[in-house]
Swiss-Prot record:
PROSITE patterns given in the database record: PB1 (PS51745)
Described function: Aux/IAA proteins are short-lived transcriptional factors that function as repressors of early auxin response genes at low auxin concentrations.
Protein name (database record): Auxin-responsive protein IAA22
Higher taxonomy: Eukaryota, Viridiplantae, Streptophyta, Embryophyta, Tracheophyta
Tissue expression profile of the protein: Highly expressed in flowers. Expressed in roots and seedlings.
Length: 265
């Protein structure tokens, strides 16, 4: 029986060490590898390099890839701006301020389906907003439910910065079918739309909220031009930001009221 490999123990007398040396078909007596000049063995079991190259997929040529690429007809394809434009917005927030106060709130117009829903949300948001109205908040809420004359006048700023009474534009942006028209008096404010979707197109859309209380006869005068806060149970007008007290008195005198206030029904 012929052995192809044998283990020979060599002794190095100079260093006094023993070490094994494997000899076989690929080794000669001097310990040199006869297969060093042949192809390199790869993996286990040993596979010739050229055989392994046959199983490796050839990388695609760059020219072939360029030929397969087709230009996109959609301009701006892949850009972040174009993706944001195609993505529908789920919210539409506008800033709401109580007249005379820097602190504001925001409300989502898309969370409401009608002006009535939005009007109720705004009234609940700003009711008792002032610290002096917190104590009587529950009583005032009850009076509002019973049909009190307490109302809110809502305006918005157009593109030119002018404050406009809302309600001319229907909720869905199309021609109004309900036949509503802007009311001349503050008493009818609750009967008309409160916030127009056109506010959202204004760069700095602001809704100014003015509170009207029972003691007033300024409905037709104040509705479109003057934003005032009428103190309930008191005989004076606290005008906010726009007109001085003297201007209001002159305006009342020109209307024949002689500057006096007549308590509403």
């Amino acid at each position: 029986m012929k052995l192809k490999a044998a283990a020979v123990v060599s002794c190095d007398f100079g260093k006094g060490k023993l070490y094994p040396q494997v000899m076989g078909a690929g080794w000669n007596e001097s310990g040199e590898n006869r297969a060093a000049s042949s192809a390199q063995l790869v993996g286990w079991p040993p596979v010739r390099t050229f055989r392994k190259n046959l199983s490796t997929p050839k990388p695609a040529d760059a020219d072939d890839l360029m030929n397969k690429m087709k230009p996109c007809s959609d301009e701006g394809h892949g850009s972040r701006d174009a993706a944001q434009e195609r993505r529908p917005s789920s919210t539409m927030f506008v800033k709401v301020n109580l007249e005379g106060y820097a602190v504001g709130r925001k409300i989502d117009l898309k969370a409401h389906r009608s002006y009535d829903s939005l009007s109720q949300a705004l009234q609940s948001m700003f009711h008792g907003f002032l610290s002096d109205g917190i104590a009587t908040r529950d009583n005032e809420l009850q009076r509002m439910e019973e049909g009190s004359k307490k109302r809110y006048v809502l305006v918005y700023e157009d593109n030119e910065g002018d404050r406009m009474l809302v309600g001319d534009v229907p909720w869905d942006g199309r021609e109004a079918g309900s036949g509503r028209r802007p009311a001349a008096g503050v008493d009818q404010v609750s009967e008309r739309p409160d916030v127009s979707p056109a506010m959202a197109t204004t760069p700095a859309a602001t809704v100014a909220v003015t509170q009207r209380r029972e003691l007033t006869n300024l409905a037709a005068t104040v509705a479109a031009h003057v934003l005032v806060f009428l103190a309930s149970g008191q005989g004076h007008i606290n005008c906010m930001m726009h007109f001085a007290m003297g201007d209001i008195v002159e305006l009342l005198e020109s209307l024949g009221t002689n500057g006096s206030l007549v308590k509403g029904d």
